[in-house]
């Protein structure tokens, strides 16, 4: 088998991992364009509250990242990525719920807060799991090649 064929096969193996990572980061980036304005103008909360709601995702990412690594070691990266995508989906459902509850701003902001927590956990699980899934997929094949480039014999 030639080197170019094996590189093509490795690239094809990694595509699904890249797709899951893309879905995760789209679910993170797209709401950033509209959520602060929605919280401030539609729900009537201050810009400080809007900032707290946005920041809650990153705080939950910070606290859930070690758990994501531990669960990846226990369950394997595919299951952790799947769980992360489910958390991102739940975040979207809570965000849609906030729109449905717009007439009751306290319930709407509560739904957004819960959704942002799910999104932070989803980011941790998807990013950690996808990174380790990629290493597991190509690491055994490419690991020795990388080692010889980094550590000369």
Residue ranges of predicted features:
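Helix-to-coil boundary motifs at intracellular loop junctions of multi-pass secondary transporters
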Residues: 38, 42-43, 74, 133-138
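Small-residue hotspots at the loop-to-helix junctions and early N-terminal turns
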Residues: 47-51
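Pair of pore-lining "gating" transmembrane helices in MFS-fold secondary transporters
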Residues: 9-37, 41
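Cytoplasmic helix-loop-helix junction between adjacent transmembrane helices
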Residues: 115-153
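C-terminal ends and interior cores of transmembrane alpha-helices
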Residues: 86-105
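Residue-level signature of mid-helix packing/kink "hotspots" within the transmembrane helices
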Residues: 58-66
């Amino acid at each position: 088998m030639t080197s170019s064929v094996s590189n093509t096969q490795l690239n094809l193996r990694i595509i699904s991992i890249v797709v899951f990572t893309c879905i995760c980061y789209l679910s993170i980036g797209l709401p950033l364009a509209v959520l602060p304005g929605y919280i401030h103008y539609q729900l009537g909360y201050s810009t400080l509250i809007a900032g707290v709601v946005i920041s809650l995702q990153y705080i939950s990412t910070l606290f859930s990242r070690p758990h994501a690594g531990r669960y990846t070691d226990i369950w394997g990266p595919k299951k952790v990525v799947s769980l992360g995508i489910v958390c991102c989906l739940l975040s979207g459902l809570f965000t849609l719920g906030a729109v449905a509850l717009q007439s009751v701003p306290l319930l709407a902001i509560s739904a957004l807060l819960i959704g942002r927590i799910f999104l932070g956990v989803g980011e941790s699980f998807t990013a950690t799991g996808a990174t380790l899934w990629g290493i597991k997929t190509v690491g055994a094949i490419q690991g020795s090649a990388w080692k010889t480039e980094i550590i000369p014999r």
